[in-house]
C-alpha cells in the first residue's frame, strides 16, 4: 500500500524494526501507523509509546496477523486493537465476507457487496466494543463446534483519541487482488489517518 499512500499525498516511512516506536515525539507527529508485525515481542517502552501515540490521536491501521496477532502477551495492546487471533480452521479455504446491511453507508464499506475469499478465515477473540463493518460465518466443516458462528472481519474503533482500523484479510499480498478487500483496507487506512476529515 506504500505506493498508493504516496499517491494520496502521504509521506511514507517504512521501518523493519519496532525501535521506530522508541521516538515518541516523532510518533505523535504521524497521521497513521500501519503495523505489519506478527507473533513477536515488544519492549515495555516500545509498547508504552505506541499506546500513548494512538491514545493521543495518531491513527492505527492493519490487517491479518500484522495487527491482531502481534504481541500475544500484551493485553493492553490487544485492548487497543480490539481483538486477538486464535485460529484459522481449515487453513486456506473458500469463504464469504458479508458487509453488514446496517453499515452500508459507512465510508469504509459504502457501495461494496458481499464477496468471496480464498485464504485463512480468522477466528478471533474480539472486544464487544468494536464497531463491526463486515463479518464471515463459519461452516463448521473444519471445527464442528463453531458451525454458524458469525465472526467480525472488518472493524473500527477508538482508543483514546486515536482511530483504529482492522481487517482480518491479507494472509498473503495476493488476497488484496480481490477488489473489495483492497478497497476496504485503503478506505480503512484513510479513516484511521483522518484523511477524509482534513
Q: What do these predicted regions represent?
A:
Residues 59-61, 133, 165:
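Structural detector of well-ordered beta-strand residues that form the stable sheet scaffold
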Residues 29, 45, 49, 76, ...:
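Extracytoplasmic/secreted proteins, especially bacterial periplasmic and envelope-associated proteins
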Residues 77-84, 115-116, 123-130, 170, ...:
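Oxidoreductase and adenylate-handling cofactor-binding alpha/beta cores
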Residues 11-13, 131, 163:
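Conserved beta-strand segments of alpha/beta enzyme cores
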Residues 7, 140-151, 158-198:
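Extracellular ligand-binding/catalytic regions of CAZymes and related secreted enzymes
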Residues 6, 29, 86, 91-160:
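Catalytic beta-strand/loop cores that center a nucleophilic Ser/Cys/Thr
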Residues 1-69:
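Helical hinge/lid and interdomain linker segments adjacent to catalytic or ligand-binding clefts
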Residues 40-111:
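A glycine-rich, often tryptophan-bearing local segment used as a flexible ligand/cofactor-contacting loop or short
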Amino acid at each position: 500500500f506504500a505506493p498508493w499512500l504516496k499517491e494520496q499525498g502521504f509521506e511514507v516511512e517504512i521501518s523493519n524494526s519496532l525501535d521506530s516506536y522508541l521516538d515518541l515525539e516523532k510518533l505523535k507527529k504521524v497521521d497513521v501507523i500501519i503495523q505489519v508485525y506478527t507473533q513477536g515481542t515488544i519492549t515495555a517502552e516500545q509498547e508504552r509509546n505506541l499506546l500513548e501515540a494512538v491514545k493521543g490521536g495518531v491513527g492505527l491501521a492493519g490487517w491479518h496477523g500484522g495487527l491482531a496477532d502481534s504481541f500475544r502477551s500484551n493485553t493492553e495492546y490487544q485492548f487497543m486493537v480490539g481483538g486477538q487471533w486464535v485460529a484459522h480452521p481449515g487453513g486456506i479455504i473458500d469463504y464469504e465476507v458479508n458487509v453488514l446491511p446496517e453499515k452500508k453507508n459507512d465510508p469504509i464499506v459504502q457501495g461494496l457487496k458481499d464477496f468471496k475469499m480464498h485464504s485463512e478465515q480468522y477466528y478471533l477473540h474480539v472486544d464487544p466494543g468494536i464497531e463491526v463493518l463486515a463479518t464471515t460465518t463459519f461452516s463448521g466443516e473444519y471445527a464442528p463446534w463453531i458451525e454458524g458462528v458469525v465472526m467480525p472481519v472488518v472493524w473500527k474503533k477508538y482508543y483514546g483519541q486515536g482511530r483504529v482500523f482492522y481487517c482480518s484479510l491479507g494472509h498473503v499480498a495476493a488476497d488484496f487482488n480481490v477488489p473489495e478487500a483492497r478497497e476496504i483496507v485503503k478506505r480503512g487506512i484513510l479513516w484511521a489517518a483522518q484523511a477524509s476529515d482534513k
